[in-house]
Amino acid sequence: MDAKSERSLKRPSWDQYFLTITRQVAERSTCLRAKVGAVIVRDRSILATGYNGSPAGLPHCTEVGCLIYESKNPDGEIELNCFRTIHAEINAITQAARNGAAIRDADIYVTHTPCIHCLKVLINTGIRTIYYGQPYKLATVTDLLRYSRVRIVQVPPEGAPP
């Protein structure tokens, strides 16, 4: 392959690469309402992955249905949630802890912006930056982000201008 051909083979940025992996991880989700994946990274190495679903060993929503409850967001919006589901970010943090991987000052890539509960946990774990693909209720986490040292960055789709 000549130099010109090599230049024409565009490699994804590291951010796009890890975000693509979050989408693959999300395919393992057993949630009927959303497929979310998370990848915790430090120095371009994956420390842990997680997807949303039931706790290990318990029945999945895909098998027995969801256990839905209502909650009210700080903005007054009523939201439907599932008792059974653990979010992707929490599963990734749990996997890191079980495997002895320290995640302080690491970054997390998530298919969607974290919910307010996951954001609070991410702040406490010392995650440095949250990279996400799709916004999800971004307004509910904006105030909390403003007071934390955690950065949040939307990764543009592959092929989008930088």
Model-predicted regions and their roles:
Residues 1-162:
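Zinc-dependent deaminase catalytic domain
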